[in-house]
Amino acid sequence: KDKIMIYGAMLAGGVGSRMKSAVIPKQFLEVEGKPIIIYTLQNMLKVDRFDYIYIATHKDYLAYMKEMVQKYTDKPEKVRIIEGGKERMDSIHNVTDAILKDEGVHEDDVIVIHDAVRPLVTEKILNDSIDAAGTYGACVCGLPAVDTMLYSEDGKVVTTIPERSKLFNG
């Protein structure tokens, strides 16, 4: 294969266990009549540079995710839905395995990994990430931290308060 491939990977394998009140995983909660994950997907689909977007979702929601892609997107052929893993890293592993199986891999190919419950991602952030990964081999997005962070060795006593200007939310 001669063409450098660019893949989007949306991680949606969680079941929202930290959201005790949720009946369904938070990525499927609706805002203005649409699941959050669909807003994220629609923003990723605006980036024409993505050859495919893989969505790693919980096995119990594979069929539902396929329905949502058909219902809400105009490019369902660019979306591939796979089973997510137990943990975030397992889902990333499943995506990379699926890409390897489906497409093969070239060392210059790019995979942009994004959390499905972060729907406000912009085309600029995604395109800048693709460019940075192409230039440097890898990149991670981050925003300057606005909250004061506390560090504790034992989880009980604050050891230090890191300088906020050196901290970023990833």
PLM feature spans:
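Residues at the starts of beta-strands that form the adenosine-phosphate
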Residues: 51-53, 78, 137-138
